[in-house]
């Protein structure tokens, strides 16, 4: 007996489940293409130092969640826990971080050692979008609206946009000094997890889920009060432009991103359709990341969407697959070759063609075609093969025959006319 099973926190995506995944991915990629965002693909495996420097050693991701190991060359390697650091590395390595501004996207598996739950696995899939070399407020607006539009296009309901500004590094440094002083006084009132964050990543305390700590934080200094005039002006312009675009938002001054490289704009999009407010998308500006990793000073902003949670949120209509256009029933040595030849020809018309490979009786093949709800059936026996022709039948919804025609395998004009008339009326061949 085979006792092998997938590891905890990993999931097999079976063919029926992947229909929904593929439909969701198709909609996302179409939206990105229409927004002139180009794909980039980076390795799943990177040097550990990349994430320590890019994400920050004090973050939960680096300190608790990474899958790290030594390879046979005694090099420390890590399965990527997120995609932005890898994109930044690729841009620096290939000398394209200094090129004119570019819009990039990636989609693929990431790895974090977390407690598995619905919509969150240890191997998970993430969509990331990065606008590299963009500094203007308008790039902040476009990245937010792009994320919003993708989620709306997928039919996600009850969307809420939360925004905040983290200021620049000077703003954050001034705030952090005041916040640390406040934490010293109030440390014992905080939950244990927040107490542990004080030395490593104090800003993450602002994002606590602990109810008691949330209440205590109401008396803490606000980062907003430490913003420079320039940072505040940028934030006010973003709010005004979102209002003009009629994109509703909520200001959340405790919203901080979990990674060290963020500056200025931070945002999350949540939904209440899962019973409580669940984050669907998170993003923000990270103007210092590329220089922090050894590249030139390069402004950038991006967002990420976890696909597992997105799939749960998407409606059942995205589970629908395209029906089989033609099922080819065939029996006999000569008929099999003709059927294979014909199936290849028909697929060039962007038709979904199922070629029966069973060699079973005609009646069994017809039953399978009916089960698949094929729009039409082609019948080829040795009698038809000798004449180099086939019979094609178009069916009604109740499986009764609508029309039937015999066509020569060499009569491309007649075949094309039949296809145009009966199967792809709305397509240009």
From Swiss-Prot:
Key words, A-Z: Aminoacyl-tRNA synthetase, ATP-binding, Cytoplasm, Ligase, Nucleotide-binding, Protein biosynthesis
Subcellular location as annotated: Cytoplasm
Listed GO biological process terms: histidyl-tRNA aminoacylation
Reaction equation(s) it catalyzes: tRNA(His) + L-histidine + ATP = L-histidyl-tRNA(His) + AMP + diphosphate + H(+)
Main localization of the protein described in the UniProt heading: cytoplasm
One GO location term (cellular component): cytoplasm
Entry's EC annotation: 6.1.1.21
GO molecular function, one term: ATP binding
Cited PROSITE patterns: AA_TRNA_LIGASE_II
Subunit: Homodimer.
Family: Belongs to the class-II aminoacyl-tRNA synthetase family.
Protein name: Histidine--tRNA ligase
Organism of provenance: Prochlorococcus marinus subsp. pastoris (strain CCMP1986 / NIES-2087 / MED4)
Annotated gene: hisS
């Amino acid at each position: 007996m085979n006792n092998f099973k997938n590891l905890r926190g990993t999931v097999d995506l079976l063919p029926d489940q992947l229909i929904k995944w593929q439909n969701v991915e198709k909609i996302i990629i179409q939206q990105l293409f229409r927004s002139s965002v180009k794909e980039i693909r980076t390795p799943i495996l990177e040097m550990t130092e990349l994430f320590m420097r890019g994400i920050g050693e004090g973050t939960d991701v680096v300190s608790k969640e990474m899958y790290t190991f030594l390879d046979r060359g005694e090099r420390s390697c890590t399965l990527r826990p997120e995609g932005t650091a890898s994109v930044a590395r690729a841009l620096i390595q290939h000398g394209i971080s200094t090129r004119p501004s570019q819009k990039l996207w990636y989609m693929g598996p990431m790895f974090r050692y977390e407690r598995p739950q619905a919509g969150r696995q240890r191997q998970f899939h993430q969509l990331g979008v990065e606008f590299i070399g963009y500094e203007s407020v308008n790039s902040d607006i476009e990245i937010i609206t792009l994320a919003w539009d993708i989620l709306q296009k997928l039919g996600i309901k009850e969307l809420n946009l939360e925004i905040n500004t983290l200021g620049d590094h000077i703003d954050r440094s001034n705030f952090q000094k005041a916040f640390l002083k406040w934490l010293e006084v109030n440390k014992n009132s905080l939950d244990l997890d927040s107490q542990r964050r004080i030395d490593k990543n104090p800003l993450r305390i602002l994002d606590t889920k602990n109810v008691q700590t949330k209440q205590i934080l109401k008396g803490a200094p606000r980062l907003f009060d430490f913003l420079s005039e320039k940072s505040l002006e940028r934030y006010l312009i973003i709010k005004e432009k979102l209002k003009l675009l009629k994109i509703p938002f909520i200001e959340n001054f405790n919203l901080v991103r979990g990674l060290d490289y963020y500056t200025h704009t931070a945002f999350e999009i949540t939904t209440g359709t899962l019973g409580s407010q669940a984050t669907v998308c998170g993003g923000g500006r990270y103007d210092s990341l590329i220089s922090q990793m050894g590249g030139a000073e390069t402004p950038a902003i991006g967002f990420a969407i976890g696909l597992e949670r997105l799939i749960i949120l998407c409606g059942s209509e995205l589970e629908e697959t395209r029906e089989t256009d033609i099922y080819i029933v065939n029996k006999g040595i000569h008929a099999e070759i003709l059927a294979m030849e014909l199936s290849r020809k028909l697929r060039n018309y962007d038709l979904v063609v199922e070629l029966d490979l069973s060699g079973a009786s005609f009646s069994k093949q017809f039953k399978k075609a009916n089960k698949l709800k094929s729009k039409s059936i082609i019948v080829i026996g040795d009698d038809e093969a000798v004449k180099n022709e086939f019979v094609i039948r178009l069916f009604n919804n109740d499986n009764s025959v609508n029309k039937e025609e015999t066509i020569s395998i060499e009569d491309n004009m007649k075949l094309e006319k039949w296809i145009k008339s009966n199967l792809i009326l709305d397509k240009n061949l």
